[in-house]
């Protein structure tokens, strides 16, 4: 018999004595509770013991709120019913309160105080403070459910849904509790859906044992009262056993593969005692993830041990076979621990003790117990007892009795107090780098580490050499959307060259690559016996030449500088005018582990292929290989050129502080203004952002006001109908201002371009346009072609004029401009420009010439050019003819353009119609050529056909072969309004001249010298469309023309500075027109109405009426009274030579099979103007 007192979870035996009455034990309970911080310390020490035995996943921490001890398995800790309880043990939902356990074998700390000792009254309050973290206000959820069912009464049942609603608990938690109580034999589940739950009658509960969870386990269930306290132990029984089984299977698999070298899953399963392959498949996959095994083949796979796992097993077996690790030493090092089992007195029975088994660190003891009878049939609950806490000073643990003091650790777990012989096997076990094992040289280790990730390889090498390796962030710069990080490797205080990149990960990798390159060269020199000169290299020295054995690194900082390799390659190809393609060569491997093989193709050149587990990584690696190959080619070509200039780097972003090419920023105006602004800000080290200033309008038509901010400077606000469009327009406006300021700074000779605040550039642009001395002799575009200069002049003028206008009014930047050069050496000046891509609707035609029928950019720029010619003719005087662009023609009746003066047309894309009717694959590269000969393409009969524009839309359709005579009333009633395409009109200009019929009364024909395109350029298709299709059959057409008309063949080409890529979506309906005579006043039209954009629908200055008005003024100024009384149509017909040439031109097109030229209704030209007096 044993004398003891009962604790919250069992008996703490001290000496043998008959068991006392439970009431007596209950009266003594409150005196025998552990006090205050002493209880906390002992509980903490028990948690240390559990951690050392491997039952806790983490070491307990003193001073922190530690979790309670895990529920004790019935097979490990004996449980006994405690004294009768009159209350419930408070606990947090689902987590029982931690309790203090004691037994004779694990008594830790000072001896127990006498049972009648009491502390001072102040100790209770301080003890409460020390146990404040253990307070709880919740209740056992199982007890809540039992109480609720008891309230219903015996024989009453309810559903889980009703319980969940009454207890305000999720239904899934209630279901889990109900089924747990059913397994314990406390509840009865009725049939039906949903099942009805009720309490088990008392008589049935006495005879019905709890249901076993797992019959093949030899550990009995705990008592119902403690199960309600600690929760359902089923999960605790299943987890460790399954883990042990998994570990055992893994060990058997590895041992078998170590002996046979390879095997299939089925063969493995049969040789380790299992039946089917599926029993080991999951374990094999887990081992494969851990890097212990690998497989080859697909159906079925053959499994092998990895080299590293085989080395570890070999080392383990050699260690176990050594003299130090003998079985006697191992058995001597561990002690068996037995837990006494005490049962309540049973009639005619004897208490059975659990068989003691050896417990090793990190394993769960599996102990078999004999069956025992329950002491009481009903549930017995523990009750919290009031007691006086210990002194508060015990909460501060003294150093000599600290949580890890060796005296408090049990002897079987205390390695310090253990005899030296017990752990001799462990202490004498050779380490991985023991001198008894061969150790590789630093050079060999570095070579192995270079095959891995640079950061991981460097850390592994530092650990190999017992050194510390740190990655220090030296500097962080750049805007928030594209920061720059500079990292440096420091090994044992030695600093290596830093590396900079756009992300911390890439910067660390680059710094690790540099450090490993230096260490590799030093180790190689040391192994070869050479003096270690490289080890004394200064920190600033950046080893650019890699070692011979160094494999290519995963990131090339000199090439990409933090950018994606794919992005860098595409930018490089774009600058070179080439297009690259990523080709998927093959796809191998299963679906869960594919291998993609990619290569980069640039034209006919193919770069080395690479393989990777994903398409994205494969493309990046292929781009890296292509960039490295391109850089090597560039370096070789630079070496071959003796005395040549330094070639620029492939990646211009390595020098972000240099001035960006304005052509690149102009490209963003036509593609992605947001990206262009961010690129501009990054190149200058500024941060860019877009702010929503205001939002108004109804939900179906909102208006968003956005404003761009770059480097603390706000740019003009814009208004749009969507947030996306608002950001684009704000970026567009900011780019125009910044580009204009950059151009001004370049023209004035500044070395660096900084954002300039202040006045508008309109006056500056006007002065530059009119003052030849203000122009620089050459454009600030090194190596640019003639067509690049034409394009730059056009965009400069457009940007300077529109930098203060809302971009939403300016269309999608389909720009056309006419540039005038006074001599071949002149840089040129823009005399007219226009934007737009719309035609007037049929219901907006005017009988008075008040609408502009065609608002395409090319047509608008030509009408502005006509206005420029009128202004120059009004200024012409034979006394000042030296400064004029005109001179007297042969016969003296008319004027003509001077021989040195030339006009050049720029269009940002191919003209609509036949000039753009080809596949983009036929596009030609920009080549500087002095040859002006044309090579038109005639591949099929449809090429060269006349085409008309689509009303209220974009694109063209071919004209019908039959005669079409559009009528005014037919169009008003809904007949399709036909407008000839821009390619057909440019063809007419190259035959009849740019001046038109009215100016032919005063001028000889004016022809274009060149045509420049920014996009969709094909020399064969463009020349066919704008001039060569009328000479397809020879010179017959040109021979039929009367003097002074000819077939003009202008020089054609495309720009190389930028390429305005295609944008999806329709262009806007607005159109801009300007000529040099207008100063810096822009006019914005609505292309579908043909009038000035706005509610007033004002008359445009490029309309027929206004141009006819200028013609009348010129007639009055030149004393041509015979033309003042004519209508618009009659005045055009009065130019007999022009009218005859036009009719011949139309007839020839019809005879050549190109179709009929469709004109507007004749009624539209029959309007008159009052005579204009000579001012």
UniProtKB/Swiss-Prot annotation:
Keyword Ligase: no
Start-end of Acidic residues biased regions: 225-235
Record-listed Phosphoserine modification sites: 228, 235, 431, 564, 579, 586, 760, 769, 771
Catalyses which reaction(s): adenosine in double-stranded RNA + H2O + H(+) = inosine in double-stranded RNA + NH4(+)
Chain positions found as Phosphothreonine: 754
Enzyme Commission code: 3.5.4.37
Compositionally biased intervals (Polar residues): 550-561, 638-648
Domain notes for this protein: The first DRADA repeat binds Z-DNA.
Annotated protein name in UniProt: Double-stranded RNA-specific adenosine deaminase
Organism expressing this protein natively: Rattus norvegicus (Rat)
